[in-house]
Amino acid sequence: MASSEKLKALQATMEKIEKNFGKGSIMKMGDDSVEQVEVIPTGSIALNVALGVGGYPRGRIIEIYGPESSGKTTLAIHAIAEAQKAGGIAAFIDAEHAFDRFYAAKLGVDVDNLWISQPDNGEQALEIAEQLIRSSAIDIIVIDSVAALTPKAEIEGDMGDNKVGLQARLMSQALRKLTGTVSKTRTTCIFINQLREKIGVMFGNPETTTGGNALKFYASVRIDIRGSQPIKDGEEVLGKLTKVKVVKNKVAPPFRKAEFDIMFGEGISHSGEIIDLGAELGIIKKSGSWYSYNDTKLGQGRDAAKVCIKDNPELAEELEGLIFEALNKK
């Protein structure tokens, strides 16, 4: 077949596909209609950089997992706050029935305009999530957590009943349905997951996430979050240093890491990130234990410098602008 005939046949096929499945259902990668990745910021400058595209990609499934009290829900709540700041609509599927509206409000969430569901079982949770995503009205949806998505058969059965693989099958079926819908509606779908230990593993990492393997495959981004050393004022623990690793990334290079402070009752410490990244990029000078910017002394010690940045919003904004400028040049 001649080249011109091939192109005609391809064009006719493309028109037929678009007629049946809608405009944009197939496109050439070089076309103008293939856009740059749209994102929702994470609420952390360091994590935005680690993700490579400036935040959580839209139209993708994200998994955030880690041990208990590592900051998984905090990270998801920050994403909701960022989406709302940009005028987006957010939903929270609270399968754990543990959502704290007062903590969410402190992190910047407009709780009065947040859609929340506390479903009775896993099937109901995922069905509600699918319908919300299918509406095309939701910008971000968080499911907290996969471990709490208990199948209806397990809830209605007796305590000792063995229901092996039910949750894994439920997740696999749900994700097959959700993936295409999430992509078409440009919704960011975040699943929070817990860690378990495999029994009898002698070599390698015994840790695994709940809900089977489906989420590992369908997620475009997987984030491993771990609490590190505590942040103290004398004997009082005020927060913890948190380490994050992007273990899977389909939109940018994976395995990048980020560190930030999570302060109890406040969430991610913005001032702490400005100090750390500013010092790393040479914007903030460190001489001994003193931190300074131009001729302004920020404080002796990191904690004092953090307080200075927190108390001066204009200075924080100026430094943040310089940090973004320096990072974009990299």
UniProtKB/Swiss-Prot annotation:
Domain of life: Bacteria
Gene3D superfamilies, per database record: P-loop containing nucleotide triphosphate hydrolases (3.40.50.300)
Keyword annotations from UniProtKB, A to Z: ATP-binding, Cytoplasm, DNA damage, DNA recombination, DNA repair, DNA-binding, Nucleotide-binding, SOS response
UniProt binding sites for ATP: 66-73
A biological process from GO: SOS response
Subcellular location per the Swiss-Prot or TrEMBL entry: Cytoplasm
Keyword Lyase in record: no
InterPro entries linked: AAA+_ATPase (IPR003593), DNA_recomb/repair_RecA (IPR013765), DNA_recomb/repair_RecA_CS (IPR020584), P-loop_NTPase (IPR027417), RecA-like_C (IPR049261), RecA-like_N (IPR049428), RecA_ATP-bd (IPR020588), RecA_C_sf (IPR023400)
GO molecular function: ATP binding; ATP hydrolysis activity; ATP-dependent DNA damage sensor activity; damaged DNA binding; single-stranded DNA binding
Pfam family for this entry, one: RecA_C
GO cellular component: cytoplasm
NCBIfam families in the record: tigrfam_recA
UniProt function note: Can catalyze the hydrolysis of ATP in the presence of single-stranded DNA, the ATP-dependent uptake of single-stranded DNA by duplex DNA, and the ATP-dependent hybridization of homologous single-stranded DNAs. It interacts with LexA causing its activation and leading to its autocatalytic cleavage.
Family classification: Belongs to the RecA family.
Name of this protein: Protein RecA
Lineage of origin: Bacteria, Pseudomonadati, Bacteroidota, Bacteroidia, Bacteroidales
